[in-house]
Amino acid sequence: MTRRKFLKIAAAGTALGLVGGPSFSLAKEEYDLAVISGQPVAATRKALEAIGGISRFVKNAQRVVLKPNMSFARTPDFSATTHPLVVATIAQACMEAGAQQVLVLDHTLQRAELCLERTGIREACKNIPGVHVLALQERKFFGEIKIPQGKVLERVEVFKEILDGHVLINIPVAKSHSATGVSLGLKGLMGMIWDRESFHSQYNINQAIADLATVIKPQLTILDATRALASGGPGGPGEVKKPNLIVAGIDPVAVDSYGVSIVPWYGQNFRSRQVEHLLVAHQKGLGKIDIDQLKILKEKA
């Protein structure tokens, strides 16, 4: 998608119909989102604390899947992948909460070994007992599920670990995307399916992402906006901004909607309703889209 095409689609998105979404809240039922500024480790810890602690989501002896973006063989300064210290901090917190095992998983787009090495995520997690970082590139690791609420998708093959009842925490990075304008939490769900190419070639990708979000529902989304790839996404190189933010919430649409507001994309500011897959997800009742109607806790780490 060219910059011009994204701008055109974004402008059209504001004219689409609107449907209210469900309510979500965080610690003490006061906030929809926690937005914490600071360095990766401190801000991530503060965000987990602000949402009531990781123990709200991870119980003793549970197995956990962390889904960062590590699809590209890029170092963290490219902002094409989730910051390794953000991932490691969350993984450590899960184990401290009593998790039996933490699997850090992604279906990488590029060569698995290079992705694991260059993103720094495997290195950051290697000394945390019970944490395993894996790139799943074989079909045997995926299982098929039906999508009852799908408009263009009837079924999809997803990580088997999701089907096995693991706690799922989505840890996307904030970046632009050539096909969808931005890539945040909902777009990042595509890293958990086998056949991503069909989203690009067979379906309206924005509708397909929203369909996918009806069956893959992370218990928690933590957006890494310590850096943001404001152009040239998803793989870069491009313009890298440094908001130094961590955004955490239960509502994936709300997290992404705030993410849209963090930096200008392609040199222009956008509203969440101008991002088609977010608007469609909101219309499906998957979350709140208007950030001026969200209760947001903002703090510094």
Give short role names for the model-derived ranges.
Residues 1-301:
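N-terminal and secondary-structure boundary signal
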